[in-house]
């Protein structure tokens, strides 16, 4: 694979983190200052480089990370008035959705697939000054609610199995899922995304910022 790491989060911010160690292994690394959409020209560059070479391209987005009102352009607002973090959060989701639509359009005629997921969720407490925040300590289930899906280009046709997973699936098993999705096989590990999901769906152990392990199903539903 020709590997690309395209990030809207600064390299300095990631120094010394697990994310930085992963990013440093990519053959090509590009960091931008600004909104997530600034990554799209670099995605086009990556797609058009080395024709015929298989590629793994990581788009490291800011998304709806707090401070949520700062992470998307105000001229893209569809929900108004912009006077609460709740409205900013809704607009940030719409902005990311629009961005993903542009990514899919760039890949529509290619033999390509996209795996999308967030690394963590956000807690919500309307009584706080900043109503969205990390659930690092004493988390509720909200802290672990993240979007995740695999999209396949129409050019792949009937070569993929499309389904919806209607049970808990932890991103703790994404290492196995990504391997299977990319066609990387290892002894005694599932060989397809469907096999990974079948083996680990319903598993509900999670951990917090202090590496304390909890049963997700035993956590309270929300922070407040």
Model segments located where?
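Short glycine/proline- and charge-enriched loop/turn segments
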Residues: 20-27, 74-84, 130-135, 156-159
């Amino acid at each position: 694979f020709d590997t690309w790491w395209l990030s809207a989060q600064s390299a300095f911010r990631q120094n010394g983190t697990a994310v930085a160690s992963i990013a440093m292994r990519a053959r090509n690394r590009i960091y931008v200052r600004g909104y997530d959409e600034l990554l799209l020209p670099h995605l086009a560059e990556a797609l058009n480089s080395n024709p015929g070479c298989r590629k793994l391209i990581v788009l490291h987005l800011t998304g709806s990370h707090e401070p949520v009102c700062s992470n998307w352009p105000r001229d893209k607002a569809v929900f108004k008035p912009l006077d609460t973090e709740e409205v900013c959060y809704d607009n940030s989701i719409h902005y990311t959705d629009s961005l993903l639509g542009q990514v899919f359009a760039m890949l529509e005629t290619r033999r390509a697939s996209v795996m999308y997921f967030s690394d963590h969720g956000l807690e919500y407490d309307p009584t706080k000054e900043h109503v969205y925040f990390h659930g690092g300590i004493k988390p509720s289930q909200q802290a672990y609610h993240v979007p995740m899906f695999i999209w396949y280009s129409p050019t792949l046709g009937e070569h993929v199995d499309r389904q919806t997973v209607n049970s808990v699936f932890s991103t703790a098993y994404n290492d196995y899922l990504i391997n299977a999705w990319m066609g990387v096989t290892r002894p005694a590990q599932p060989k397809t995304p469907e096999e990974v999901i079948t083996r680990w769906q319903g598993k509900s152990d999670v951990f917090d910022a202090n590496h304390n392990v909890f049963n997700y199903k035993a956590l309270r539903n929300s922070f407040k």
